[in-house]
C-alpha cells in the first residue's frame, strides 16, 4: 500500500487555490492511496495531485471524513469527477449529504454513497471500515483501509478515540500496518475550546503510548502525525516536537510505502 500526502494542515490552512499558495504553507487535508482512492478532497488537492504525477483520471473513490472546508471543496470534487474515467463514488457520513450542496447536474458525475458508523465497504480492491470520530457534532468519520494484507487507520479531526472506535481497533488482532493521527495542536498554548475534538500537546504522547501498549501499533508501526496546526507551515518546532513524541511528522508531498 502506497500513500501520498496531498495536504497536511489543520483548519487555518490557506483556503486558496494551489496557484496562489505560498511555498512554505501546508495545504488543506487530503491523502491519496495508490489504486485510485482519495481521502478528503480539499481545495488544493486536485492541482497538487497532478503536480505529484498522480493519475487523477484514475481516481474511482473518494472517502470524506466530514465536510468542513479544510477537508471538502465542491469545486475540487467536481474537478476529479469530471476528469475521471468512470463515474466517481463519494463515500460520506449520511448526515453530510445535504452539506455537499450537489446539484442534479453535479450528480451526473458523482455517485453519493452515504455510510453509517461501523459499516464495512468493499471497493477499489480494498475493504474499508467506517468508524465514529470524536469531532464537531459527532458526524465525522474515521477509516481503516485494508488492502493486500496491509491496514491503514485514518483518523484526522478527533481527540483520542471514541469507545466504539477504540474497541474495534483493540480487538486482539495483529497490529495495524500504519496509523495517521490528528495532530492539530502540537504546541502550546492549548486552545481548550477545541481540546475535546482535536489532539493536543498533552494528548499526543499518550496516544502513542496507548497504541503501543494495547498492541494496536507494533513497536515499529509507523504512527504518522497529520492535520498539523499552529504553525501552519512546514517550518517551526511542530515537526521536531512530534518526532520526539514518537510520530512521523507528515508533510505535503510525503510518500510512504506501508
Predicted segment positions?
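Conserved beta-strand hairpin/beta-sheet module of binuclear metal-dependent hydrolase folds
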Residues: 1-52, 139-156
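Short amphipathic alpha-helix with an adjacent loop that forms part of the alpha/beta core around
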Residues: 50-53, 121-124, 165-172
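Metallo-beta-lactamase
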Residues: 85, 91-141, 146-148, 247-256
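Short active-site oxyanion
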Residues: 35-37, 60, 85-90, 151-152, ...
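Cap/insert and terminal regions of metallo-dependent hydrolase folds
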Residues: 161-257
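Active-site metal-binding motif and surrounding structural segment of the metallo-beta-lactamase
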Residues: 43-91, 175-179
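Divalent metal-coordination and catalytic microenvironments
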Residues: 3, 40, 49, 66, ...
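Active-site metal-binding loops of divalent metal-dependent hydrolases
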Residues: 8-9, 36, 43, 67, ...
Amino acid at each position: 500500500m502506497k500513500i501520498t500526502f496531498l495536504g497536511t494542515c489543520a483548519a487555518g490552512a490557506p483556503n486558496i487555490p494551489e496557484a496562489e499558495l505560498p511555498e512554505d504553507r501546508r495545504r488543506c487535508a487530503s491523502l491519496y492511496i495508490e489504486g485510485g482512492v482519495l481521502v478528503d478532497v480539499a481545495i488544493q488537492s486536485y492541482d497538487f495531485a497532478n503536480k505529484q504525477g498522480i493519475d487523477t483520471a484514475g481516481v474511482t473513490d473518494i472517502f470524506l471524513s466530514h465536510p468542513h472546508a479544510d477537508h471538502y471543496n465542491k469545486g475540487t470534487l467536481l474537478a476529479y469527477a469530471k476528469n475521471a474515467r468512470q463515474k466517481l463514488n463519494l463515500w460520506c457520513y449520511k448526515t453530510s449529504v445535504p452539506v455537499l450542496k450537489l446539484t442534479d447536474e453535479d450528480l451526473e458525475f458523482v455517485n453519493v454513497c452515504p455510510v453509517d458508523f461501523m459499516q464495512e465497504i468493499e471497493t477499489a480492491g480494498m475493504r474499508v471500515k467506517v468508524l465514529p470520530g470524536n469531532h464537531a457534532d459527532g458526524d465525522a468519520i474515521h477509516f481503516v483501509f485494508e488492502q493486500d494484507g496491509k491496514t491503514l487507520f485514518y483518523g484526522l479531526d478527533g481527540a483520542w478515540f471514541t469507545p466504539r472506535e477504540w474497541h474495534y481497533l483493540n480487538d486482539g488482532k495483529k497490529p495495524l500496518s500504519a496509523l495517521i493521527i490528528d495532530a492539530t495542536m502540537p504546541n502550546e498554548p492549548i486552545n481548550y475550546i477545541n481540546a475535546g475534538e482535536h489532539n493536543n500537546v498533552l494528548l499526543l504522547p499518550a496516544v502513542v503510548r496507548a497504541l503501543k501498549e494495547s498492541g494496536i501499533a507494533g513497536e515499529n508501526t509507523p504512527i504518522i502525525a497529520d492535520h498539523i496546526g499552529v504553525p501552519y507551515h512546514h517550518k517551526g518546532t511542530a515537526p521536531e516536537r512530534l518526532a520526539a513524541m514518537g510520530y512521523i511528522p507528515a508533510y505535503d508531498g510525503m510518500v510512504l510505502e506501508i
